[in-house]
């Protein structure tokens, strides 16, 4: 990495300028805190850049209990509270799946729309500057989202500074904030336990089965009930569906996929609204 980029990372929390940013005419800045390391760092940068920032978190009712601790730690770091948004209709992902009779496809999952998009849209105002914690390797996805949502003003300070997720882990460690439990269990992202968007990832589901057997079994039963499979495996050169309860025994060996559930999933989620 270039020395200039390294320097940017070292001073990122002291910086008060977002590259190419501008406060919206209304003056309202909203940071979408997802309880992940990247969104925490992005929120802190936004606060030091803009001063007054409204921090919001969409509670899906299906994430790890340790997230409550992480939120409190981050609130102390931010020096202000996080506003929790919640669906008025559904308490968790399973209620969404059962009501919609659907889990996931290549076009997305209904849980994102109901538990994240709708609560977020209810507080959104035209002219808001929105802060998201997307990292340096996601710039192409941001460009696509901006093209399709030209009415929204988006700032991604981590992309502006070429900051990666690993950089964010290091920053939180330096300020004494313990990472969420899901990371420590080997999950790449701090998403819902048993995220159905982890498609074609047998190792991910082995990790869910190992640490969260109750959620694994509940999702497996829903697959059978709805006749929908989340995963496929390659056999004899062909991709074939496999139910969760058919996954062979054993511990996960590979790395989890980089599962996204937020800003870039929202356009897909529109079809389930």
Regions found by a protein language model. Give the residues of each.
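Nucleotide-activated chemistry modules centered on ATP-dependent adenylation/adenylyltransferase
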Residues: 2-273
